[in-house]
Amino acid sequence: MAQNVYGPGVRMGNWNEDVYLEEERMRHFLEKREKGELLIQRNRRVKKNILRPMQLSVSEDGYVHYGDKVIIVNPDQVLGEEAGKFMRGDLSLCMSPDEVKAQLSDDLEIPCGVSAVQTIAPMGRNTFTILSDGANSCEMGQVVVYGQNFCLGIAAGLEGKMLYLTSDHRTLLKSSLKSGLQEVTLTDEVTHLNCWQAAFLDPQLRLEYEGFPVRANEKIVIYHRHTNRALAVHRNLFLRTYFGKEMEVVAHTYLDSHKVEKPKNQWMLVTGNPRNKSNTMLDISKPITEDTRALEQAMGINT
């Protein structure tokens, strides 16, 4: 019968190589931890930078100005003709970095994706700055008017590099992930593809309002200057992003039977709350309208 002739103190196999390998792994781990190159450390830095709380600009005259920090919100809408799951609530435009590439480098990949998320809290990933396109040379603090070009920039990465919301015609190799329509991304290049325009909500009054100031916290339509496509959100198409499940954002104009842009094309440039700098104007409670129907019925008043 076979017996083990070696005692418990005898080492077998390539034990010396295994010891050196374990020591090398530990030394490599400690070096990466000191340099902050561990995956968990990169993940924490990225989330801390992107999710940092931001303070929006407060509009004193009720209009939007160049240099203002705003969040771009698609207001809540009722269930439309889309089939399947439909996301309700106010959705804000956010940058959506690639999950793998965001953990391999401190800088975000270019181009960087965008999506819509169900939050209106101002943070690093959804706070945009309204900038001049360079051609009209508008000064900071000047009012933005309908039909005027502007750029939407967002500070990204640990160095705070400015990225610009951009779009271009779709091709066979370049289109949105879910719908296959014209995609919207963020880039660090300053080109004519970064220009956007605000259009009045009512198309019958759009020509009359051209050249008038754009009011903050009111519904508008944001058109891409180069392709003449409106910014849109698909509440029924979900993307798996670095922060979870979010909605797809594209550049496509959806018109109803009256040639009016559908709610998925309607956006608001939301500014800060003057009462509480950490909140937005959407957090201000609206005046409650008293319901007098029960009182009128009790008094015998027919309405």
From Swiss-Prot:
Main location group: cytoplasm
Coiled coil: none
InterPro entries to which the protein is assigned, alphabetical: CF161, MIR_dom_sf
Gene Ontology terms: biological process: flagellated sperm motility
Subcellular location field: Cytoplasm, Cytoskeleton, Cilium axoneme; Cytoplasm, Cytoskeleton, Flagellum axoneme
Keywords: Cell projection, Cilium, Cytoplasm, Cytoskeleton, Flagellum
A GO CC term attached to the entry: axonemal A tubule inner sheath
Cytoplasm among keywords: yes
Entry superkingdom: Eukaryota
RNA-binding keyword on record: no
Database matches in Gene3D superfamilies: 2.80.10.50
Subunit structure: Microtubule inner protein component of sperm flagellar doublet microtubules.
Functional description taken from the UniProt entry: Microtubule inner protein (MIP) part of the dynein-decorated doublet microtubules (DMTs) in cilia axoneme, which is required for motile cilia beating.
Protein name in the entry: Cilia- and flagella-associated protein 161
Organism for this UniProt entry: Mus musculus
